[in-house]
Amino acid sequence: MAGHDSGSAKRGRSPSFGVFVRKPVERAPTKGAGDGAADSEAIRIDAAQPWPDDAVEVGAVVDAYGLKGWVKLVAHAGAGRGGDALLKARDWWLQKGGERKFARVTQAKLHSDAVVAHPAGSVDRDTALALRGFRVFVRRGDFPALAADEFYWVDLIGLDVVNEAGVALGKVADMIDNGVHSIMRVEYPATGKDGRPTTGERLIPFVGVYVKAVEQAAGRIVVDWEADY
């Protein structure tokens, strides 16, 4: 959201598509007045391609690639993981500040630790350079399908967390990858030492020992975890 997005509760594997974490995007060099707009005019949002309700930010354009209009992107979740959505989706929505564009991608592939792609209408290096700094969004519906015991983090964030006794533990506010397995960061209403309302936090490993069920339709995750842990 990151923002990579998936993990396995049963096997405790590292996520194959984790939370989206925005990475710094190098600012494009300033060009002459009107040059950038002219170069990228062929790639734009129009009434036929409205911004989708399920748009998820998955990466950003960082440079041109070659001379034929290809762009180089960094996937917020890491190439090969966040890259999965960038590679599969053929419709991209681009945003930089208040400017939005639509791009139909004709080809996309992994290149070293990045993703390179050719948007239709990007005909040369100058056109590609004009897209530097644009954040890339794809529809959640265009994400690759996962196995039954895998989940995209973007689908877990916001779910209620309850234990097996039905005690509410809070909501998933974030997902963390510690290199071994995923961890849910759960927030809940609490009271501070001064008696004022505050937000408490629980860190629950997203592994089968603790996660007993992910009930997306019901909007909750059932865990073997006590409120006083």
Swiss-Prot record:
Pfam families: PRC_RimM, RimM
Organism of this sequence: Burkholderia thailandensis (strain ATCC 700388 / DSM 13276 / CCUG 48851 / CIP 106301 / E264)
Function statement: An accessory protein needed during the final step in the assembly of 30S ribosomal subunit, possibly for assembly of the head region. Essential for efficient processing of 16S rRNA. May be needed both before and after RbfA during the maturation of 16S rRNA. It has affinity for free ribosomal 30S subunits but not for 70S ribosomes.
GO molecular function term, any single one: ribosome binding
Lineage: Bacteria, Pseudomonadati, Pseudomonadota, Betaproteobacteria, Burkholderiales
InterPro entries: PRC_barrel-like_sf, PRC_RimM, RimM, RimM_N, RimM_N_sf, Transl_B-barrel_sf
Superkingdom to which the source organism belongs: Bacteria
Entry text on domains: The PRC barrel domain binds ribosomal protein uS19.
Domain PRC barrel: from-to ranges: 148-229
Gene3D superfamilies: PRC-barrel domain, RimM
Region (Disordered) location: 1-39
Name of the featured protein: Ribosome maturation factor RimM
GO cellular component, one term: ribosome
Keywords: Chaperone, Cytoplasm, Ribosome biogenesis, rRNA processing
GO biological process: ribosomal small subunit biogenesis; rRNA processing
Main location, first listed in the record: cytoplasm
Subcellular location: Cytoplasm
Subunit structure: Binds ribosomal protein uS19.
Family: Belongs to the RimM family.
